[in-house]
């Protein structure tokens, strides 16, 4: 008998994947966590019925969250990742030699535990000497920080459950306070097909706080619609004005210096959302 997992991305649309076996399942303090082995995408992390990452396509999301802001900032030394318990963003952050410390604040320690066990190629960097892992509320961590970070990356789930506070104007204001005077932040902001209002609202809120606010995209097969957006807010540096000598060689599968700028070229219907 074949076993299939289906994520209902809207009431009337979803994606499905053939499952070889279930590796782990439990209701944590915060959410339903499932780790499964799929036929097509390798091991897959699912939270509250939503695909968070897979071994096959994880590099797209993690590279685009990390490298766009880190190449935009001329000397990022202290980096904060809110969420991201699978460790993929941290792995990419550590590819930048200027980064002296990377802090991960993940509310659900079980995500970290089982990512290390079943997604070692993604989570392996969490034990690096430059990394500090904190299990706790990222919203509260931001509120308690001031003038501390060069770059903050918000690697959250959808705006439901424990992540709901990470999509508010108050949170973005807190991020601005936690950043240094030339700091940059980036957040995943879902897709323009099914959640256009979210993108419009987030960009509007961020624009009221950060003088440079831009939206960029990436193609991620297992995420709703496949077209994913990220919002970047910067106090000083424009991601579209990065000099050529800023780009140093790192090993990537998706991100390139050409794609860095190209990712900000938006389809018209997406650009219309943020006019």
Swiss-Prot record:
Quote the record's binding site residues for spermidine.
62, 86, 155-158
Which EC class, in a word?
A: transferase
Give UniProt keywords alphabetically: Cytoplasm, Polyamine biosynthesis, Spermidine biosynthesis, Transferase
Which reaction is the catalytic activity of this chain? S-adenosyl 3-(methylsulfanyl)propylamine + putrescine = S-methyl-5'-thioadenosine + spermidine + H(+)
Alphabetically, which GO biological process terms does the record hold?
spermidine biosynthetic process
Q: Name one Pfam family in it.
A: Spermine_synt_N
Alphabetically, the GO molecular function entries are: spermidine synthase activity
Q: In which pathway does it act?
A: Amine and polyamine biosynthesis; spermidine biosynthesis; spermidine from putrescine: step 1/1
The annotated active site, in chain numbering, is: 155 (proton acceptor)
Gene Ontology annotations for the cellular component aspect, listed alphabetically: cytosol
Q: What is its EC number?
A: 2.5.1.16
**Signal peptide (from-to):** none
Tell me which InterPro entries the record gives: PABS, PABS_CS, SAM-dependent_MTases_sf, Spermi_synthase, Spermidine_synt_N, Spermidine_synt_N_sf
Q: Which family does it belong to?
A: Belongs to the spermidine/spermine synthase family.
User: What's the subunit arrangement here?
Assistant: Homodimer or homotetramer.
NCBIfam families xref list: MFS_SpdSyn, PRK00811.1, speE
Protein role: Catalyzes the irreversible transfer of a propylamine group from the amino donor S-adenosylmethioninamine (decarboxy-AdoMet) to putrescine (1,4-diaminobutane) to yield spermidine.
Protein name stated in the entry? Polyamine aminopropyltransferase
Give the source species: Bacillus cytotoxicus (strain DSM 22905 / CIP 110041 / 391-98 / NVH 391-98)
């Amino acid at each position: 008998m074949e076993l299939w997992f289906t994520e209902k991305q809207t009431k009337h649309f979803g994606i499905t994947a053939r499952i070889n076996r279930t590796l782990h399942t439990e209701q944590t303090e915060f959410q339903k966590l499932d780790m499964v082995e799929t036929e097509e995408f390798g091991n897959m992390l699912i939270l509250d019925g939503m695909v968070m990452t897979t071994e096959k396509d994880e590099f797209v999301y993690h590279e685009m969250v990390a490298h766009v802001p880190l190449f935009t900032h001329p000397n990022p030394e202290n980096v904060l990742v809110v969420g991201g318990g699978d460790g993929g963003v941290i792995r990419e952050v550590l590819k930048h030699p200027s980064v002296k410390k990377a802090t991960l604040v993940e509310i659900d320690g079980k995500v970290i535990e089982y990512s290390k066990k079943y997604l070692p190629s993604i989570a392996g960097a969490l034990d690096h000497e430059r990394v500090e892992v904190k299990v706790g509320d990222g919203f509260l961590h931001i509120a308690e920080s001031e003038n501390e970070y060069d770059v903050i990356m918000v690697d959250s789930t959808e705006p439901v459950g424990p992540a709901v506070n990470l999509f508010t104007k108050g949170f973005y204001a807190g991020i601005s306070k936690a950043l240094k005077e030339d700091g940059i932040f980036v957040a995943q902001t879902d897709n323009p097909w099914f959640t256009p209002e979210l993108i419009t609202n987030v960009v509007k809120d961020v624009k009221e706080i950060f003088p440079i606010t831009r939206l960029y995209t990436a193609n991620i097969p297992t995420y709703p619609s496949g077209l994913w957006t990220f919002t970047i807010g910067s106090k000083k540096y424009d991601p579209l004005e990065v000099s050529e000598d800023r780009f140093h060689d790192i090993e990537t599968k998706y991100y390139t210096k050409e794609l860095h700028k190209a990712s900000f070229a938006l389809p018209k219907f997406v650009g219309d959302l943020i006019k």
